[in-house]
Amino acid sequence: MTRVINLDGESLTIEDVIAIARQGVACHIDDSAIEAVNASRKIVDDIVSEKRVVYGVTTGFGSLCNVSISPEDTVQLQENLIRTHASGFGDPLPEDAVRAIMLIRINSLVKGYSGIRLSTIEKLLELLNKGVHPYIPEKGSLGASGDLAPLAHMVLPMLGLGKAYYKGELLSGQEALDKAGIDKISLAAKEGLALINGTTVLTAVGALATYDAIQLLKLSDLAGALSLEVHNGITSPFEENLHTIRPQSGQLATARNIRNLLEGSQNTTVATQSRVQDPYTLRCMPQIHGASKDSIAYVKSKVDIEINSVTDNPIICKDGHVISGGNFHGEPMAQPFDFLGIAISEIGNVSERRVERLVNSQLSKLPSFLVKYPGLNSGFMITQYACASLASENKVLAHPASVDSIPSCENQEDFVSMGTTAARKAFEILKNSRRIVATEIMAACQALDLKPENHELGKGTKVAYDLFRKEVNFIEHDKHIEIYDELNKASAVIEDPSFLEAVEQAVELSIQF
């Protein structure tokens, strides 16, 4: 039976977002939402017919809020809004981000506080389910008043305007609708504002980054465990007794993950008089990785709220009362997404240091740069440089966007969140850190193959090693390989959900205790 996710404005999960955005799962407006949507729309119709002054319905926008709009111009006002606010720059957002944007906007609208017609919401839903993906430039949002520019680009194809992708082809908005068998619409009063005024873009991009960060945290524990196998790591720093007396949830979870991954390993060791303790990047994984786990768990809790929230303005209350407020302001998510970037950056940073330990013959006691006949061969020399470059780039990207603001709209919108920048930066940091972690796994597997004695790996590390080696080759020497290809294979392996799923079938991994 084909899976369909019902949207009621209350119960959307981050896993649902992934299913619809990346796996093409269909969605449907839950029957429970229809009455509230219709009631909200009737209130807007009454406002127009009674010529009441309500922001964005019978007035202009932003600093033009005191300009009255006649009832006969309220429809043109909404189309003008979309045409002029679609002012984004840069490359288009990827398909999964666009689908997440469409989904989260629909889920917000079905709560029934935006005064939009049910048929208009259903039109956006039809585009989503039929795979018409608006061309949305990635830059141009201040994160307050919501994500106006990118969301206006989302709306254009609904009107037969702008550009959209359909079956991988970039078309005019009208042509995309025609090929998908979708009729264009005209907007009614308030509908343009209802579609574009909200934190939807920053929330969608940040939600994808948060989900991927959760997977990366588990992969980073796996990478660290493989490095411990190479270095014959001391296991006492991961004993439960050590962490229960400092019961930070992420720390406890990391220590347990490492224990589970290394269960049965014949490579790990205990402290001796000649070797009392390992360096921080190995010994302090629970504390370092755990701190990032706690930060990302907090971010996820904020995402869970935001994807089920109304971020429109004005709000049409159930009793007919209209409130002009600030739910569109992105600050509640801008700060968490800055935390997200910092947390992921630390994971990339510590992983790069472990890559250095693997390729450094003085630290690993293996051939320099993990290749036979170093000198004639350079092996992983520049691979470590590349990881260092990414880690250093992350340190620049991790500077918070939310500490900045710039006044706009004739100083009416005088403090903005820059939350969309925070979310986009977090995703860039995620991609960089994922590359570094993939390289650590690749280097650790190479190092294990170079060790003079092949001892049994742990319960989880063995599964990971075997799967990884099916796709990524051992590098014998430089002559017949292009290491770039192997690095890309390594990244592809860990980005494939089936890799981590297979490891988790063997051992339990979590980010919270």
UniProtKB/Swiss-Prot annotation:
One of its GO terms (cellular component) is cytoplasm. It catalyses: L-histidine = trans-urocanate + NH4(+). The modification 2,3-didehydroalanine (Ser) is found at residue 145. Pathway: Amino-acid degradation; L-histidine degradation into L-glutamate; N-formimidoyl-L-glutamate from L-histidine: step 1/3. The keyword Lyase applies. Gene3D superfamilies: Fumarase/aspartase (Central domain), Fumarase/aspartase (N-terminal domain). There is a cross-link at residues 144-146 (5-imidazolinone (Ala-Gly)). GO terms for molecular function: histidine ammonia-lyase activity. Belongs to the PAL/histidase family. HAMAP family: His_ammonia_lyase. This is Histidine ammonia-lyase.
